[in-house]
Amino acid sequence: MGDSLSPEEKLSLITRNLQEVLGEEKLKEILKERELKVYWGTATTGKPHVAYFVPMSKIADFLKAGCEVTILFADLHAYLDNMKAPWDVLELRTSYYENVIKAMLESIGVPLEKLRFIKGTDYQLSKEYTLDVYRLSSVVTQHDAKKAGAEVVKQVEHPLLSGLLYPGLQALDEEYLKVDAQFGGVDQRKIFTFAEKYLPALGYSKRIHLMNPMVPGLTGSKMSSSEEESKIDLLDRKEDVKKKLKKAFCEPGNVENNGVLAFIRHVLFPLKSEFVILRDEKWGGNKTYTAYLDLEKDFADEVVHPGDLKNSVEVALNKLLDPIREKFNTPALKKLSSAAYPDPSKQKPAVKGPAKNSEPEEVIPSRLDIRVGKVISVDKHPDADSLYVEKIDVGEAEPRTVVSGLVQFVPKEELQDRLVVVLCNLKPQKMRGVKSQGMLLCASVEGVNRKVEPLDPPAGSAPGERVFVKGYEKGQPDEELKPKKKVFEKLQADFKISDEYIAQWKQTNFMTKMGSVSCKSLKGGNIS
């Protein structure tokens, strides 16, 4: 296909869906004369997850544009980065990566014979490369080396020398792989600019750098191999995919920090050029979107329900994962997977003294700062028909701004001056441009006629009074819940409305000093 494209068409394919390009003019000049040589490298650390489909889809674009593409399995980098891959499993993890990356490429129809695969240690241990590492270390400052790796190399209080070497080796890879361009995530930008600064100091040319956006995880933060709850593994079973998507942050009408929408935008749309929302005929039937922004708008306007969005992603994702699961269902690859990533629970613990602060944090209700609030004012969100912007007195000097998706469920007059229950220690986040400083907790019942009701504090409660689960009233709430730790999400899984309309956690009542928290009519409902 590349032979039949003009330089402009090749440029469009190479740069589509990228967040940033450094050296675009040089890229244009090369495309006028010959095919681009580009490489993508991946350190063989944690198990690859579904966000790896983002670079895979770009590799498909590069091949369509006629590029000569190299995939580097950066095994030495995996060890240098605070030994994320211990030396004794380094070779096994590299083999795992090679097999799983090839399976991913095959699942999206990329011909493997057009790619060059190489391991870092195939050339990084040579005399010439080692000498260049020493040459580079003589001109690079400690400050620049640490700054370059800040977004990629694990940050610790006392950095190891190996982590400071990491950016320099990645820069040298561009020369030793004989490429025109390096492709990676925007989190690599500081390493890319480091390479642009220091390669010329060794007499080597500055390369082009192509950067794709980072995909938020299911919790709204960056999707990470080291955060189990934030990502879907390529070998996760269908039931695990369903479970993780069910827990994913996907608030009605909220397109900010929405990991499910982000996955559609950055993974599913580039691969298929369309996305189908699967839903019952009574809700309008299936709908096909050929432009992501149309889907985002419908979600923001609550035309598309989070449940339908998650179910549709589940179906599309499993179609991508099925060929990979099938390939890894052989005895040889099962054995490789177990050896490369041994189950920590089956490993014998090392005999050491007690570690400081080694006990895991308890996920208990007292960590939530839940208070009685009084709604001072209610207005429609200026940019979202489905959202209210409320000012709520929670016993502080100033009322808090809280954004909630209640327009379709609760009339404005019913909220005005009402006592409500507010979760106050979530990390503030923007919802369609307005920063929300809390969550108004509600009961809800899903189904044909979805119903939502704010929780009611007991009569006589006052703004600022603490809401607690009986038996956990003495614990101290976290100052701010860290999104990565998912404390609220883990506790919320056991929130329920009892048959007596009482809000409960694990069948234990939510209370204030005046009595139990309740809702008007939604027995058996969920709480969010």
Swiss-Prot record:
GO annotation (BP), single: tyrosyl-tRNA aminoacylation
Residue window of motif Nuclear localization signal: 242-247
Amino-acid positions noted as binding trans-resveratrol in the UniProt annotation, renumbered to this chain: Y39, Q170, D173
UniProt motif ('HIGH' region) ranges: 44-52
InterPro entries, alphabetized: aa-tRNA-synth_Ic, NA-bd_OB-fold, Rossmann-like_a/b/a_fold, tRNA-bd_dom, Tyr-tRNA-ligase, Tyrosine-tRNA_ligase_regulator
Gene Ontology molecular function, alphabetical: ATP binding; small molecule binding; tRNA binding; tyrosine-tRNA ligase activity
Domain of life: Eukaryota
Residues that hold L-tyrosine according to the record: Y39, Y166, Q170, D173, Q188
Location in the cell: Cytoplasm; Nucleus
Modified residues (N6-acetyllysine): K197, K206, K474, K482, K490
Cellular component, GO annotation: cytosol; nucleus
Regulation acting on activity, per entry: Resveratrol strongly inhibits the tyrosine--tRNA ligase activity.
Reactions it catalyzes: tRNA(Tyr) + L-tyrosine + ATP = L-tyrosyl-tRNA(Tyr) + AMP + diphosphate + H(+)
Annotated motif 'KMSKS' region, positions: 222-226
Disordered: annotated span: 338-362
Annotated positions of the N-acetylmethionine modification: M1
E.C. designation(s): 6.1.1.1
Similarity-based family: Belongs to the class-I aminoacyl-tRNA synthetase family.
Function, as annotated: Tyrosine--tRNA ligase that catalyzes the attachment of tyrosine to tRNA(Tyr) in a two-step reaction: tyrosine is first activated by ATP to form Tyr-AMP and then transferred to the acceptor end of tRNA(Tyr). Also acts as a positive regulator of poly-ADP-ribosylation in the nucleus, independently of its tyrosine--tRNA ligase activity. Activity is switched upon resveratrol-binding: resveratrol strongly inhibits the tyrosine--tRNA ligase activity and promotes relocalization to the nucleus, where YARS1 specifically stimulates the poly-ADP-ribosyltransferase activity of PARP1.
Name listed for the protein in its UniProt record: Tyrosine--tRNA ligase, cytoplasmic
